[in-house]
From Swiss-Prot:
PANTHER family per UniProt: INOSINE TRIPHOSPHATE PYROPHOSPHATASE, INOSINE TRIPHOSPHATE PYROPHOSPHATASE/HAM1 PROTEIN
Name the record gives this protein: dITP/XTP pyrophosphatase
Organism: Streptococcus pyogenes serotype M18 (strain MGAS8232)
Top EC class for this record: hydrolase
Region named NTP pyrophosphatase: 130-324
Assembly and oligomerization: Homodimer.
Length: 328
Protein backbone atom coordinates (compact mmCIF):
# COMPACT_ATOMS: atom_id res chain seq x y z
CA UNK A 1 0.00 0.00 0.00
CA UNK A 2 1.50 3.30 -1.10
CA UNK A 3 1.45 6.72 0.56
CA UNK A 4 0.17 8.32 -2.64
CA UNK A 5 -2.44 11.08 -2.35
CA UNK A 6 -5.15 10.84 -5.01
CA UNK A 7 -7.26 13.77 -6.21
CA UNK A 8 -10.09 14.28 -8.68
CA UNK A 9 -11.55 17.72 -9.34
CA UNK A 10 -14.05 19.19 -11.80
CA UNK A 11 -16.66 21.93 -11.49
CA UNK A 12 -19.14 19.57 -9.81
CA UNK A 13 -16.96 17.14 -7.85
CA UNK A 14 -13.76 17.33 -5.80
CA UNK A 15 -12.35 14.33 -3.96
CA UNK A 16 -9.05 13.76 -2.14
CA UNK A 17 -8.10 10.28 -0.97
CA UNK A 18 -5.45 7.82 0.13
CA UNK A 19 -5.28 4.15 1.02
CA UNK A 20 -5.37 3.49 4.79
CA UNK A 21 -6.26 0.77 7.27
CA UNK A 22 -9.97 1.56 7.25
CA UNK A 23 -12.80 2.71 4.98
CA UNK A 24 -13.90 6.30 5.52
CA UNK A 25 -15.81 8.82 3.40
CA UNK A 26 -16.26 12.26 4.95
CA UNK A 27 -16.97 15.79 3.82
CA UNK A 28 -19.66 18.02 2.39
CA UNK A 29 -22.84 17.38 0.49
CA UNK A 30 -23.04 13.59 0.73
CA UNK A 31 -26.00 12.07 2.56
CA UNK A 32 -25.16 9.62 5.33
CA UNK A 33 -27.37 7.03 3.64
CA UNK A 34 -25.41 7.45 0.39
CA UNK A 35 -22.08 7.04 2.20
CA UNK A 36 -23.35 3.85 3.86
CA UNK A 37 -24.56 2.44 0.52
CA UNK A 38 -21.20 3.15 -1.13
CA UNK A 39 -19.28 1.68 1.83
CA UNK A 40 -21.44 -1.45 1.74
CA UNK A 41 -20.91 -1.74 -2.02
CA UNK A 42 -17.13 -1.36 -1.80
CA UNK A 43 -16.78 -3.57 1.28
CA UNK A 44 -18.01 -6.36 -0.96
CA UNK A 45 -15.38 -5.46 -3.53
CA UNK A 46 -12.64 -5.30 -0.90
CA UNK A 47 -13.48 -8.82 0.19
CA UNK A 48 -12.51 -10.09 -3.29
CA UNK A 49 -9.14 -8.30 -3.37
CA UNK A 50 -5.85 -9.87 -2.36
CA UNK A 51 -4.48 -6.96 -0.37
CA UNK A 52 -1.86 -7.00 2.36
CA UNK A 53 -3.30 -5.72 5.64
CA UNK A 54 -4.07 -3.02 6.54
CA UNK A 55 -6.45 -2.11 3.75
CA UNK A 56 -9.07 0.51 3.12
CA UNK A 57 -9.67 3.97 1.70
CA UNK A 58 -9.95 7.39 3.29
CA UNK A 59 -11.72 9.92 1.06
CA UNK A 60 -12.47 13.56 1.82
CA UNK A 61 -15.29 15.10 -0.22
CA UNK A 62 -14.90 18.82 -0.91
CA UNK A 63 -17.58 19.04 -3.61
CA UNK A 64 -20.13 16.38 -4.60
CA UNK A 65 -22.77 15.89 -7.27
CA UNK A 66 -23.51 12.17 -7.65
CA UNK A 67 -22.36 8.72 -6.53
CA UNK A 68 -21.00 7.85 -10.00
CA UNK A 69 -18.02 10.19 -9.75
CA UNK A 70 -17.28 9.23 -6.15
CA UNK A 71 -17.44 5.49 -6.81
CA UNK A 72 -15.31 5.90 -9.94
CA UNK A 73 -12.71 7.84 -7.93
CA UNK A 74 -12.46 5.16 -5.22
CA UNK A 75 -12.35 2.30 -7.74
CA UNK A 76 -9.57 4.10 -9.61
CA UNK A 77 -7.60 4.25 -6.34
CA UNK A 78 -8.18 0.53 -5.78
CA UNK A 79 -7.17 -0.33 -9.35
CA UNK A 80 -3.94 1.65 -9.14
CA UNK A 81 -2.99 0.18 -5.75
CA UNK A 82 -3.80 -3.43 -6.67
CA UNK A 83 -3.25 -3.57 -10.45
CA UNK A 84 -6.85 -4.69 -10.88
CA UNK A 85 -9.09 -3.73 -13.81
CA UNK A 86 -12.44 -3.13 -12.16
CA UNK A 87 -14.76 -1.11 -14.40
CA UNK A 88 -17.48 1.29 -13.30
CA UNK A 89 -20.37 1.12 -15.75
CA UNK A 90 -23.53 3.27 -15.48
CA UNK A 91 -26.51 1.27 -16.69
CA UNK A 92 -30.22 2.13 -16.65
CA UNK A 93 -29.93 4.27 -13.54
CA UNK A 94 -27.69 1.81 -11.68
CA UNK A 95 -23.90 1.59 -11.36
CA UNK A 96 -22.31 -1.76 -12.18
CA UNK A 97 -18.87 -2.85 -10.95
CA UNK A 98 -17.38 -5.44 -13.30
CA UNK A 99 -14.07 -7.19 -13.89
CA UNK A 100 -13.13 -9.74 -16.56
CA UNK A 101 -16.74 -9.95 -17.78
CA UNK A 102 -17.97 -10.73 -14.25
CA UNK A 103 -20.45 -8.62 -12.31
CA UNK A 104 -19.03 -7.86 -8.86
CA UNK A 105 -21.59 -5.48 -7.39
CA UNK A 106 -24.51 -3.18 -8.25
CA UNK A 107 -25.29 0.26 -6.81
CA UNK A 108 -29.02 1.03 -6.88
CA UNK A 109 -30.47 4.55 -6.67
CA UNK A 110 -33.02 5.44 -4.02
CA UNK A 111 -36.27 3.75 -4.92
CA UNK A 112 -34.51 1.20 -7.14
CA UNK A 113 -35.13 0.78 -10.88
CA UNK A 114 -37.74 -1.17 -12.77
CA UNK A 115 -36.73 -4.54 -14.18
CA UNK A 116 -38.08 -3.45 -17.57
CA UNK A 117 -35.65 -0.53 -17.64
CA UNK A 118 -32.71 -2.53 -16.30
CA UNK A 119 -33.10 -5.40 -18.77
CA UNK A 120 -34.05 -3.23 -21.76
CA UNK A 121 -32.21 -3.88 -25.01
CA UNK A 122 -29.25 -1.72 -25.94
CA UNK A 123 -31.40 0.08 -28.51
CA UNK A 124 -33.24 1.67 -25.58
CA UNK A 125 -30.12 2.66 -23.67
CA UNK A 126 -26.40 3.09 -23.97
CA UNK A 127 -26.00 -0.68 -23.72
CA UNK A 128 -22.47 -1.77 -24.60
CA UNK A 129 -22.05 0.27 -27.79
CA UNK A 130 -22.16 3.98 -28.57
CA UNK A 131 -22.42 5.29 -32.13
CA UNK A 132 -20.47 8.54 -32.42
CA UNK A 133 -21.71 10.78 -35.23
CA UNK A 134 -18.31 11.50 -36.75
CA UNK A 135 -15.85 10.06 -39.26
CA UNK A 136 -12.95 11.83 -37.55
CA UNK A 137 -10.68 9.10 -36.18
CA UNK A 138 -8.80 11.52 -33.93
CA UNK A 139 -12.03 12.56 -32.22
CA UNK A 140 -13.20 8.94 -32.12
CA UNK A 141 -9.95 7.89 -30.44
CA UNK A 142 -10.56 10.38 -27.64
CA UNK A 143 -14.13 9.13 -27.14
CA UNK A 144 -12.91 5.51 -27.26
CA UNK A 145 -10.36 6.23 -24.52
CA UNK A 146 -12.97 7.99 -22.40
CA UNK A 147 -15.82 5.50 -22.81
CA UNK A 148 -13.48 2.51 -22.70
CA UNK A 149 -12.82 3.33 -19.05
CA UNK A 150 -16.56 2.94 -18.47
CA UNK A 151 -16.86 -0.35 -20.34
CA UNK A 152 -18.39 0.85 -23.62
CA UNK A 153 -17.46 -0.05 -27.18
CA UNK A 154 -17.38 2.92 -29.55
CA UNK A 155 -18.42 2.92 -33.21
CA UNK A 156 -18.30 5.83 -35.61
CA UNK A 157 -19.77 6.63 -39.01
CA UNK A 158 -16.91 4.86 -40.78
CA UNK A 159 -18.62 1.67 -39.59
CA UNK A 160 -21.73 2.78 -41.53
CA UNK A 161 -20.44 3.99 -44.93
CA UNK A 162 -23.95 4.03 -46.38
CA UNK A 163 -25.00 6.92 -44.13
CA UNK A 164 -24.98 10.40 -45.70
CA UNK A 165 -22.95 13.35 -44.49
CA UNK A 166 -24.98 15.68 -42.29
CA UNK A 167 -24.44 19.33 -43.22
CA UNK A 168 -23.43 21.43 -40.22
CA UNK A 169 -25.58 24.44 -41.07
CA UNK A 170 -26.16 25.63 -37.51
CA UNK A 171 -24.76 28.86 -36.12
CA UNK A 172 -24.15 27.48 -32.61
CA UNK A 173 -22.40 24.39 -31.27
CA UNK A 174 -25.68 23.00 -29.94
CA UNK A 175 -27.50 23.44 -33.26
CA UNK A 176 -24.79 21.51 -35.11
CA UNK A 177 -24.59 18.74 -32.51
CA UNK A 178 -28.38 18.33 -32.56
CA UNK A 179 -28.44 18.18 -36.35
CA UNK A 180 -25.92 15.34 -36.39
CA UNK A 181 -27.25 13.32 -33.45
CA UNK A 182 -30.95 13.57 -34.29
CA UNK A 183 -30.51 12.98 -38.03
CA UNK A 184 -28.31 9.89 -37.60
CA UNK A 185 -30.57 8.52 -34.85
CA UNK A 186 -33.61 8.93 -37.11
CA UNK A 187 -31.84 7.15 -39.99
CA UNK A 188 -30.46 4.25 -37.94
CA UNK A 189 -32.93 3.84 -35.08
CA UNK A 190 -29.93 3.83 -32.74
CA UNK A 191 -28.89 5.93 -29.80
CA UNK A 192 -26.34 8.39 -31.17
CA UNK A 193 -23.87 10.71 -29.50
CA UNK A 194 -22.78 13.78 -31.47
CA UNK A 195 -20.50 16.57 -30.48
CA UNK A 196 -19.69 19.92 -31.94
CA UNK A 197 -16.44 21.29 -30.64
CA UNK A 198 -14.29 24.23 -31.47
CA UNK A 199 -11.85 26.84 -30.34
CA UNK A 200 -13.02 30.28 -29.22
CA UNK A 201 -10.34 32.98 -29.21
CA UNK A 202 -11.27 36.10 -27.27
CA UNK A 203 -9.12 38.47 -29.34
CA UNK A 204 -10.95 37.25 -32.46
CA UNK A 205 -14.43 37.76 -31.03
CA UNK A 206 -14.94 34.04 -30.42
CA UNK A 207 -13.66 32.86 -33.79
CA UNK A 208 -13.02 30.34 -35.20
CA UNK A 209 -15.89 28.92 -33.10
CA UNK A 210 -18.28 26.70 -35.05
CA UNK A 211 -16.05 27.18 -38.09
CA UNK A 212 -12.97 25.74 -36.33
CA UNK A 213 -12.64 22.70 -38.61
CA UNK A 214 -12.74 24.82 -41.78
CA UNK A 215 -11.16 28.04 -40.50
CA UNK A 216 -8.58 28.16 -43.30
CA UNK A 217 -11.07 27.42 -46.08
CA UNK A 218 -12.86 24.52 -47.79
CA UNK A 219 -9.63 22.51 -48.15
CA UNK A 220 -8.66 23.09 -44.52
CA UNK A 221 -6.19 20.86 -42.68
CA UNK A 222 -5.00 21.00 -39.08
CA UNK A 223 -1.71 22.54 -40.20
CA UNK A 224 -3.44 25.19 -42.34
CA UNK A 225 -5.89 26.07 -39.56
CA UNK A 226 -3.09 26.47 -37.03
CA UNK A 227 -1.07 28.60 -39.44
CA UNK A 228 -4.05 30.90 -40.09
CA UNK A 229 -4.76 31.24 -36.38
CA UNK A 230 -1.16 32.21 -35.60
CA UNK A 231 -1.24 34.70 -38.48
CA UNK A 232 -4.44 36.31 -37.15
CA UNK A 233 -2.80 36.76 -33.74
CA UNK A 234 0.60 37.85 -35.04
CA UNK A 235 0.26 41.36 -33.59
CA UNK A 236 -1.14 40.22 -30.22
CA UNK A 237 1.97 39.91 -28.06
CA UNK A 238 0.77 39.59 -24.45
CA UNK A 239 -0.26 36.09 -23.45
CA UNK A 240 -3.19 37.32 -21.35
CA UNK A 241 -4.63 38.90 -24.51
CA UNK A 242 -4.31 35.57 -26.37
CA UNK A 243 -6.84 33.86 -24.08
CA UNK A 244 -9.00 31.13 -25.59
CA UNK A 245 -11.31 28.27 -24.69
CA UNK A 246 -11.90 24.89 -26.25
CA UNK A 247 -15.68 24.27 -26.19
CA UNK A 248 -17.66 21.05 -26.53
CA UNK A 249 -21.41 20.52 -26.76
CA UNK A 250 -22.56 16.89 -26.58
CA UNK A 251 -26.02 15.77 -27.67
CA UNK A 252 -27.44 12.27 -27.16
CA UNK A 253 -30.41 11.45 -29.38
CA UNK A 254 -32.58 8.34 -29.50
CA UNK A 255 -35.87 7.43 -31.19
CA UNK A 256 -38.93 8.86 -29.43
CA UNK A 257 -36.89 10.67 -26.78
CA UNK A 258 -36.05 14.29 -26.04
CA UNK A 259 -32.36 14.84 -26.70
CA UNK A 260 -29.88 15.29 -23.85
CA UNK A 261 -27.46 18.25 -24.05
CA UNK A 262 -24.31 18.98 -22.00
CA UNK A 263 -21.54 21.54 -22.48
CA UNK A 264 -18.02 22.13 -21.16
CA UNK A 265 -15.07 24.45 -21.75
CA UNK A 266 -11.28 24.19 -21.31
CA UNK A 267 -9.57 27.57 -20.78
CA UNK A 268 -6.08 28.47 -21.92
CA UNK A 269 -4.05 30.62 -24.29
CA UNK A 270 -2.85 30.52 -27.88
CA UNK A 271 0.91 30.01 -28.15
CA UNK A 272 3.13 31.84 -30.63
CA UNK A 273 4.30 28.58 -32.21
CA UNK A 274 3.13 24.94 -32.22
CA UNK A 275 4.62 22.37 -29.87
CA UNK A 276 4.00 18.68 -29.13
CA UNK A 277 3.28 15.54 -31.11
CA UNK A 278 0.03 14.28 -29.54
CA UNK A 279 -3.61 15.15 -30.05
CA UNK A 280 -5.05 16.78 -33.16
CA UNK A 281 -6.64 20.00 -34.38
CA UNK A 282 -5.48 23.07 -32.48
CA UNK A 283 -3.77 21.08 -29.70
CA UNK A 284 -0.22 22.08 -30.78
CA UNK A 285 -0.95 25.81 -30.34
CA UNK A 286 -3.19 25.62 -27.24
CA UNK A 287 -1.50 26.32 -23.89
CA UNK A 288 -3.35 24.57 -21.06
CA UNK A 289 -4.46 27.10 -18.45
CA UNK A 290 -1.52 28.47 -16.47
CA UNK A 291 0.60 25.31 -16.87
CA UNK A 292 2.71 26.50 -19.80
CA UNK A 293 2.23 23.10 -21.45
CA UNK A 294 0.67 22.69 -24.88
CA UNK A 295 -2.28 20.31 -25.23
CA UNK A 296 -0.29 18.33 -27.82
CA UNK A 297 2.34 17.60 -25.15
CA UNK A 298 -0.15 15.74 -22.95
CA UNK A 299 -0.59 11.98 -23.00
CA UNK A 300 -4.11 10.78 -23.79
CA UNK A 301 -5.02 9.98 -20.18
CA UNK A 302 -3.75 13.38 -18.99
CA UNK A 303 -5.68 15.20 -21.69
CA UNK A 304 -8.89 13.30 -20.99
CA UNK A 305 -8.79 14.36 -17.34
CA UNK A 306 -8.55 18.03 -18.28
CA UNK A 307 -10.04 18.57 -21.72
CA UNK A 308 -13.37 20.07 -22.71
CA UNK A 309 -14.39 16.73 -24.21
CA UNK A 310 -13.39 14.78 -21.10
CA UNK A 311 -15.31 17.20 -18.87
CA UNK A 312 -18.37 17.01 -21.12
CA UNK A 313 -18.37 13.20 -21.13
CA UNK A 314 -18.17 13.12 -17.33
CA UNK A 315 -21.08 15.57 -17.15
CA UNK A 316 -22.98 13.35 -19.57
CA UNK A 317 -22.39 10.27 -17.44
CA UNK A 318 -23.66 12.14 -14.38
CA UNK A 319 -27.01 13.08 -15.92
CA UNK A 320 -27.58 10.21 -18.35
CA UNK A 321 -29.17 7.70 -15.90
CA UNK A 322 -31.84 10.18 -14.80
CA UNK A 323 -32.47 11.20 -18.43
CA UNK A 324 -32.79 7.56 -19.47
CA UNK A 325 -35.20 6.74 -16.65
CA UNK A 326 -37.32 9.84 -17.36
CA UNK A 327 -37.54 9.10 -21.07
CA UNK A 328 -38.24 5.34 -20.76
Amino acid sequence: MSEKIYEYKDENNWFIGKMTGHNLISGWGVKHTTIKKIDDLLDGIAATLDWENPKGYDVSVVRYQSPLSLITFIIDMINQETQREIKVIPHAGTILLMENAKLLAVYLPEGGVSTATFFATSEQGFGDTILIATRNEGKTKEFRNLFGQLGYRVENLNDYPELPEVAETGTTFEENARLKAETISHLTGKMVLADDSGLKVDALGGLPGVWSARFSGPDATDAKNNAKLLHELAMVFEQKKRSAQFHTTLVVAAPNKDSLVVEAEWPGYIATQPKGENGFGYDPVFIVGETGRHAAELEADQKNQLSHRGQAVRKLMEVFPAWQAKQS
